[in-house]
Amino acid sequence: MKGLFVTIEGPEGSGKTTLIQSLLPYFEQKEQKVMATREPGGIAISEDIRTILHKQEYTMMEARTEALLYAAARRQHLVEKVMPALNEDYLVLCDRFIDSSLAYQGYARGLGMDKVFEINRFATEDCMPSLTIYLDIEPEVGLARIAKDAGREVNRLDMEDISFHKRVREGYLQVVERFSDRIVLVNADQPMEKLIEEVIQVIEDKLL
């Protein structure tokens, strides 16, 4: 693996997608081979799994089913899109990766971080990011952002109550502590322009 694998993590409404859309042209202008992708999704099979995971009517989905579907989507995305790009020396910017599963299914759903981590170690063959940026934000602020975004389709996870979203953030903070060697916490409750500048600085300082 020759490229650089940067993952962007955060709760709902933390600004991950907007951030990545801004990072992409910046690194392109620097003549850096760069690719943006997302989880779950990024390729046809994983996008189909994303549709299943996000369907509002699938409220009966059991936590283990959810965790395994995310891991399956992750596996296919990794081997079909991420690894080939890394082998071609790309900087890969990925919206979510393993840490999402640890926070959402491992902690918030109560499956246990260690169990979910083992599922994903199997799925990814221990492929881990070069760097992870965690966008930290209070759940109330993130959900308020989502409510104001008329263009965003509300998914099954968005519909969870506030206690779930608080557990997600608690889980993320534990993940940050556990993997402090590769995760950098950035305050997402700031103007997007400043957030972009800060994240660019982190990536360039750590990797480039």
From Swiss-Prot:
Which GO molecular function entries does the Swiss-Prot or TrEMBL record give? Answer: ATP binding; dTMP kinase activity
Matching entries from InterPro entries are given as: P-loop_NTPase (IPR027417), Thymidylate_kin-like_dom (IPR039430), Thymidylate_kin_CS (IPR018095), Thymidylate_kinase (IPR018094)
**EC class:** transferase
UniProt-annotated binding residues for ATP: G10, P11, E12, G13, S14, G15, K16, T17
Q: What is its EC number?
A: 2.7.4.9
The reply to whether Nucleotide-binding figures as a keyword in the UniProt entry is yes
GO BP, sorted A to Z: dTDP biosynthetic process; dTTP biosynthetic process; dUDP biosynthetic process
Pfam families in the record, alphabetically?
A: Thymidylate_kin (PF02223)
Query: According to the UniProt record, which cysteines are disulfide-bonded?
Result: none
Q: Which UniProt keywords apply?
A: ATP-binding, Kinase, Nucleotide biosynthesis, Nucleotide-binding, Transferase
Gene Ontology CC terms, in alphabetical order: cytosol
Reactions this protein catalyses:
dTMP + ATP = dTDP + ADP
**SUPFAM superfamilies from the entry?**
P-loop containing nucleoside triphosphate hydrolases
Does the keyword Zinc feature in the UniProt annotation?
no
HAMAP family listed in its UniProt record: Thymidylate_kinase
Give the PANTHER family listed for this entry. THYMIDYLATE KINASE, UMP-CMP KINASE 2, MITOCHONDRIAL
| UniProt family annotation | Belongs to the thymidylate kinase family.
Annotated function? Phosphorylation of dTMP to form dTDP in both de novo and salvage pathways of dTTP synthesis.
- Its recorded name reads Thymidylate kinase
Q: Which organism is it from?
A: Bacillus anthracis
Q: What is the lineage of its organism?
A: Bacteria, Bacillati, Bacillota, Bacilli, Bacillales
What gene name is listed for this protein? tmk
